[in-house]
Amino acid sequence: MNTSDALRLLSAFTSAQWGMVTSRQAKGAGVDGVTLHRLEKAGHLDRVRHGVYAATIAAATEVREEQAAWLMLNAAEPAWKRTPLDPDGGVISHESAARLHRLGELVDDRIVLTTPRRRTSRDPDVCFRVAGLLEDDVTTIDGLPVTTALRTVRDLLAQRIDSSHIATIIQEAVEANLLRLDVLAEHIGPYALRYGVRRPGDGEALLEQLLAGIGTSITQLAHRPTPPRY
């Protein structure tokens, strides 16, 4: 297959998948691995992750690695046919979701995805968590399904993330209008004991304790001016 024909076939995917195509999608379109390798050597494609290639003319986004990891979960299926709760896919979550929401400063370069069933990966940079998500738990960022700020905070509390880190994420999420304090308090009661709150199930007490650790409170945060986000 000549170069122009191969690129034309691949463009059906790259034009609608952030400039990327999986090797399985390429094979299904009639472009084999040998041709992909030849296109890569010729400078038409870059290898993003194992089994995922990007057209070199496509602009890379800040979340290209996450996009590539998500594509690989259901590598044969085009992105435009997948739903946010794709049973064969997953949702960006936990630390990765906080990063995509631009919340907090958690240091973890791994890509974390929540999947409805157990998954494994040979890629040490990809980590899976198994959980059942609801539609209200998921939003979209740059075309990717990502857990909402509320669900992300709940997941991080379940992981026992350091209280100051989680409090900062909560503060920034509230300031960005991604999270309501009253709604959060209703959902985080189950994590109160593990953070040392003496009243089991008291989400408001847990929230107050977390915020006190970074020098603020529910009342202060609810009434403070919202700083600009850049």
Where are these regions (language model features)?
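Short gly/ser-rich loop at a beta-strand->alpha-helix junction or flexible surface loop bordering the NTP-binding
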Residues: 2-148, 152, 159-230
